[in-house]
Amino acid sequence: MNSPIDKLERKLGYQFKDAGLINLALTHRSANSKHNERLEFLGDSILSFVIADDLYHRFPKVNEGDMSRMRATLVRGHTLAELGREFDLGDYLKLGPGELKSGGFRRDSILADAVEAIIGAIYLDSDIEKVRSIVLSWYNSRLEAIKPGVSQKDPKTRLQEFLQGRRKPLPVYTVTNIKGEAHNQEFTVECEVAGVDKPVIGKGTSRRKAEQAAAETALEQLTNG
């Protein structure tokens, strides 16, 4: 009889030799004193390397700035959370009662962190070449679609250029809340933008990420509204 983890492994395209690693990768700090943050730290570095290496060889004539922007697009929390949802990762996460109640299994930051932790776990369970092949299989369609150029500018830059092009004042970002312990904080930022009726809210694990999230939402409202 197949276990839930067997089903997840099929979605990931990798079967763990050490089941303890995948279980640890799925354990949020709210659920246990042994949690996935160290694996997340490892996976973050591995992901950045694998994507940078692929972009370097895929785009031999593209400069460092464009490669950095493409990598940032591919490894940002929103993209990782999309991957997590493709794997139905929220169904497998181990969360504490508070996070369960607040819908943590749907939260971008928790899904993104778990994807990075799984990458770290696969590396420890195998080797760098295996984890490279797995990560590239997950990213295949995104790597095929990505192109250097303006679309890779971060949301804050794109919002600023959008407003400047229309002779509008620049956005104002204000941190309205910081919660959590120093190593596991969530920032809430309000972004006031000309042309948007009320401040746009963004959340993230750093001030910068929260500002980028707010800018992305503001751009969507300005261009779709």
Swiss-Prot record:
The active site is at D44, E116. This is Ribonuclease 3. PROSITE patterns: DS_RBD, RNASE_3_1, RNASE_3_2. It comes from Vibrio parahaemolyticus serotype O3:K6 (strain RIMD 2210633). Residues 154-224 form the DRBM domain. GO terms for molecular function: double-stranded RNA binding; metal ion binding; ribonuclease III activity; rRNA binding. One of its GO terms (biological process) is tRNA processing. Digests double-stranded RNA. Involved in the processing of primary rRNA transcript to yield the immediate precursors to the large and small rRNAs (23S and 16S). Processes some mRNAs, and tRNAs when they are encoded in the rRNA operon. Processes pre-crRNA and tracrRNA of type II CRISPR loci if present in the organism. It is found in: Cytoplasm. Pfam families: dsrm, Ribonucleas_3_3. Residues 5-127 form the RNase III domain.
